[in-house]
Amino acid sequence: IYVLMICTGLTAYYTGRSIGRSRCAGAVTMVLYTMGHYHLEDVYTRFALGEVAAMVFIPLAFLAIYDLTEMGHSRKGLLCVSYSCLMLSHTISFVLCVVMGIIWMCARWKRIAACRRLIGAVCMEALACAVLTCYYWLPVLEQFADGMFYVSNEPAFYTHEETQTLLAIVSGRYSVAFIEIGILALMVFVSIYKKVYNKKALMCLVTAAVLLVCETKIFPWKLIDRTPFVSIQFPWRLNMFTEFFVALGLALQSVDIIKLLPSYRRNACLCAAGSILIGIFSLNMVWNIELGGYVNYPEGYADNTGSTDSIGFWEWLPAEGDLATSVGSENSGMVKCEDTYIRGRYGSDGSYEFDAGEAAGECIVPKYYYKGYEACSVSKSGATEYITVSKDAQTGLVKLDNIQKYSKVRVYYKNTIIQKTSKCISFCGAVLILMHAAYISIRKSKRRVKQHGEK
């Protein structure tokens, strides 16, 4: 968590400094984004490490698309790297960033269309991102093609049921601390009055306000629930972006206002100190208000499977599966061979072993079926035989055919052909990209040396 927090601060600082062209802007963006309410919620209340990891790369993803249209694509490869990291850390955040990128491209289409080189650059970086991450998304698509899952038929959450009220937004639950929006608006209004308002900061304010409104029922989330975007689950996830735009807007506007005042360095320090105070305010809200509802667990809570089973979302289980008849049943963890139940052993590598004893024929193993499972049995004579593995249509568990008496059976997961191939593709792609980056770097250094020699 500490490493992720530090990395979040570094990426936010780099983004704020690059867009604001000021170290002060970078510092303010870093503090406000890292100590933003929703970020602290993710760390201390929701313990959503995937989303916390994704928040490291959201500033870089925005900087990549901003650089593409506003800076002449000077940071080549940033789009590929940031979106690849988002894909591998938190898929939903990746999808939301793709939507953000599409909206940005549509808004700046004239500039992109005027420079066809940018279209080619986007396509090449998107292709590189797909190659680098195919070892993740190709196996996922393979599993979806092989069977149905709860996430397809019965999502755990519907977005229209998880919207925020305006009161909840103002109070700050799962939201940015509203004081940040207020300060940003005040700074923009003061700057407009002084006629030094920052257009980028104003756009950040408008974007943040729109995102907050989108968390309410005003946005047509019921229509979203009819599409695959139902996997967003919680509309208040948008606070990842709201917090970033608030932090960036405050940073950009602060720099412009500070320039009006004498003693730039002193006022820059005061600005950074003020942002830290806002961050401490957010931390206090999370610590004193939110955490209070999570520390008073009843005695024996962790030992009660009825309480803890729901922590692991079941939406990635096969659609035929039912926790009540597997994890929550009296015979949980046991192999069913007709009317006989056999206690087996789970291995540290995810495998499952059991001794068949008198049982023979068809058996149901307490492991949910996914494409790639294999099984083998060792008879008394020591002969090894591979067993046909399939999915039980009633429970979604692994089904084994033709178990022999007194054999030792082991069920384990083995990579499919697509998984092995996709890993090779990603590895080769990464090597080629690194070689290309090294070649570009060497060529640039030679060019600098040549130019220096000519001078």
What feature does the model see in each segment?
Residues 47-48, 53-57, 228, 236-238, ...:
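Solvent-exposed, flexible loop/coil residues
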Residues 291-350:
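Membrane-interface segments at or immediately adjacent to transmembrane helices
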Residues 1-293, 408-412, 418-455:
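Membrane-embedded transmembrane-helix bundle of lipid-linked glycan/lipid transferases
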Residues 326-455:
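Active-site-proximal, structured, solvent-exposed surfaces of multi-pass membrane proteins
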Residues 75, 128, 279, 306-308, ...:
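Alpha-helical protein-protein interaction elements
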